Swiss-Prot record:
Gene: rplU
HAMAP family: Ribosomal_bL21 (MF_01363)
Signal peptide per UniProt: none
GO biological process, one term: translation
Molecular-function GO terms, alphabetical: rRNA binding; structural constituent of ribosome
NCBIfam families documented for this protein: L21 (TIGR00061)
UniProt keyword annotations, A-Z: Ribonucleoprotein, Ribosomal protein, RNA-binding, rRNA-binding
CC annotations in GO: cytoplasm; ribonucleoprotein complex; ribosome
Protein family: Belongs to the bacterial ribosomal protein bL21 family.
Name of this protein: Large ribosomal subunit protein bL21
Domain of life: Bacteria
Role of this protein: This protein binds to 23S rRNA in the presence of protein L20.
């Protein structure tokens, strides 16, 4: 059985036991989270939402929170001496999918 969930402005295809990296939720490691925006529940019978499947949820537990590797942004304009260096680390949450209800 699989499901497609929407969280953090993105969509993820998940199955039970999967560990996925999503946008930061602000939840402690070990806590449970429930995703209510389930777009599709697949398996023996396919349920497609309009836009979400009524009554379907996905339960997960938080594995860890962290920050991704640093991405360097370097702006440069020739002949003017202008250059600017900037770094960014995106915060993320890793969750393990425990159960798909739907």
């Amino acid at each position: 059985m699989y499901a497609i969930i929407a969280t953090g402005g993105k969509q993820y295809k998940v199955s039970e036991g999967d560990i996925i990296t999503i946008e930061k939720l602000g939840v402690e490691a070990g806590e449970k989270v429930t995703f209510d925006q389930v777009l599709v529940v697949g398996g023996d019978d396919l349920k497609v939402g309009d836009p979400t499947v009524a009554g379907a949820t996905v339960e997960a537990s938080v594995v860890k929170e962290g920050r991704a590797k640093k991405v360097i942004v370097y702006k440069y304009k020739r002949k003017t001496g202008y250059h600017k260096k900037n770094g960014h680390r995106q915060a993320f949450t890793q969750v393990k999918i425990e159960k798909i209800n739907g």
